């Protein structure tokens, strides 16, 4: 899910942090991709476009493999070097959210059954989307496919978004590819959304830069984390009556959640029973990840042609001609080679931010910068000429 209303809040208060690009703009970039959100997009897209999931002769769903194979080839032929990161065990704090999701899926399954009986195609499609989730088996199938393609994977001990952020902060990747906005809360330097969307949707990539978000909102990263908790995340409930605008205003004024709590009217804004904000804050700031220095070398290998044909065509029932065409594109990419941009290997240097970021900004606005309008000096040569 990510962070509620964070995208719209950034669009309104830090618009320069967001820009739109096409895929080719990221040629030479290494991108850590959240595999779970990608798989969900593939399952949704193919169900929507085809009206049903793709299946092999044994009745097994293959939509996730279809999407993973062809979209990864598309990324690589555009010069992007993907690293797919898979979720590990969900944190204990997320158990409440997972239980809610399970209940919503069960409810959607019942509604889907009723919509099918009535024959309402719009409702069928709507409820069908709500029942979709990637299974553990589908995760393992995608891992196998990527290994055969020669694409590196990382198994996160916990949340994939947190591991993606660690890869970015440690200089192993330039950006995170995910739909979850909490990637920014976790400290990813650049977030790319819609990276694995179907091309049929014709949506540009949305790029969000964390440092520009903090500048635009005039917050430190610690304050931003507290803002995200107030907005609503996967790990705790929200305070009733405090929406996105009020959350932003209160963090801007009070700087942290504990001071916000001290200054609200608890009759109007009751604190929920489950509001372990200190634990959630710690989870965002120090998540369970494999540190970059402890990871094995990340390498893009030659595709296993025979293995791919055996798996996709022999086991999964894919069209052999199309698979061969995909493999040829992969091989061509490997033969041509795309040079990784040099700045990919260096983590973005964060400028020191005072806890009272607002006062620093005010000072900045009142002091003229060297070379700025109103502070230009006349060239020395002209001064000398005037003395003659």
UniProtKB/Swiss-Prot annotation:
Chain positions recorded as Mg(2+) 2 binding sites: 180, 182, 234
Residue ranges, annotated region (Disordered): 349-388
EC nos: 3.1.-.-
Major subcellular location class: nucleus
Compartments, record wording: Nucleus, Nucleolus; Nucleus, Nucleoplasm; Mitochondrion
Cofactor info, note text: Binds 2 magnesium ions per subunit. They probably participate in the reaction catalyzed by the enzyme. May bind an additional third magnesium ion after substrate binding.
Binding site for Mg(2+) 1: 34, 87, 159, 161
Record field: compositional bias (Basic residues): 375-388
Subunit structure: Interacts with PCNA. Three molecules of repG bind to one PCNA trimer with each molecule binding to one PCNA monomer. PCNA stimulates the nuclease activity without altering cleavage specificity.
Function: Structure-specific nuclease with 5'-flap endonuclease and 5'-3' exonuclease activities involved in DNA replication and repair. During DNA replication, cleaves the 5'-overhanging flap structure that is generated by displacement synthesis when DNA polymerase encounters the 5'-end of a downstream Okazaki fragment. It enters the flap from the 5'-end and then tracks to cleave the flap base, leaving a nick for ligation. Also involved in the long patch base excision repair (LP-BER) pathway, by cleaving within the apurinic/apyrimidinic (AP) site-terminated flap.
Protein name: Flap endonuclease 1
Annotated region (I-domain), positions in chain: 123-254
GO MF entry, a single one: 5'-flap endonuclease activity
One annotated Gene Ontology cellular component of this protein: nucleoplasm
Region (Interaction with PCNA) residue spans: 338-346
């Amino acid at each position: 899910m990510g962070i509620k209303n964070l995208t719209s809040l950034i669009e309104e208060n830090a618009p320069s942090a967001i820009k739109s690009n096409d895929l080719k703009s990221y040629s030479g970039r290494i991108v850590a991709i959240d595999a779970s959100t990608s798989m969900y997009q593939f399952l949704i897209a193919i169900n929507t476009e085809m009206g049903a999931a793709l299946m092999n002769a044994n009745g097994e769903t293959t939509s996730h493999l279809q999407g993973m194979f062809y979209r990864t080839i598309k990324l690589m032929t555009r010069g992007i070097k993907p690293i797919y990161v898979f979720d590990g065990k969900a944190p204990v704090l997320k158990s409440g959210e997972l239980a809610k999701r399970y209940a919503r899926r069960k409810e959607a399954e019942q509604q889907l059954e009723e919509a099918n009986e009535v024959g309402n195609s719009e409702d069928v499609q709507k409820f069908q989307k709500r029942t979709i989730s990637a299974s553990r088996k589908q995760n393992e199938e995608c891992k196998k496919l990527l290994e055969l393609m020669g694409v590196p994977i990382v198994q996160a001990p916990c949340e994939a978004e947190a591991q993606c952020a660690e890869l970015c902060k440690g200089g192993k990747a330039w950006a995170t590819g995910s739909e979850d906005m909490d990637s920014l809360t976790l400290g990813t330097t650049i977030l790319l959304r819609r990276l694995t969307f179907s091309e049929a949707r014709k949506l540009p990539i949305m790029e969000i830069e964390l440092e520009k978000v903090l500048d635009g909102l005039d917050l430190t990263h610690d304050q931003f984390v507290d803002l995200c908790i107030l907005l609503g995340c996967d790990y705790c409930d929200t305070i009733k009556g405090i929406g996105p605008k009020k959350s932003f205003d209160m963090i801007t004024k009070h700087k942290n959640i504990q001071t916000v709590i001290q200054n609200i009217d608890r009759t109007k804004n009751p604190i929920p029973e489950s509001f372990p904000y200190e634990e959630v804050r710690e989870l965002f700031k120090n998540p369970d990840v494999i540190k970059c220095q402890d990871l094995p070398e990340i390498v893009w290998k030659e595709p296993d042609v025979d293995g791919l044909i055996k798996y996709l065509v022999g086991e999964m029932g894919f069209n052999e001609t199309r698979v061969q065409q995909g493999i040829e594109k992969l091989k061509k990419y490997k033969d041509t080679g795309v040079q990784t941009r040099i700045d990919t290997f260096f983590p973005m240097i964060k400028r020191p931010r005072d806890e009272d970021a607002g006062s620093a900004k005010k000072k900045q606005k009142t002091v003229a910068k060297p070379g700025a309008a109103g502070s230009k000096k006349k060239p020395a040569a002209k001064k000398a000429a005037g003395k003659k």
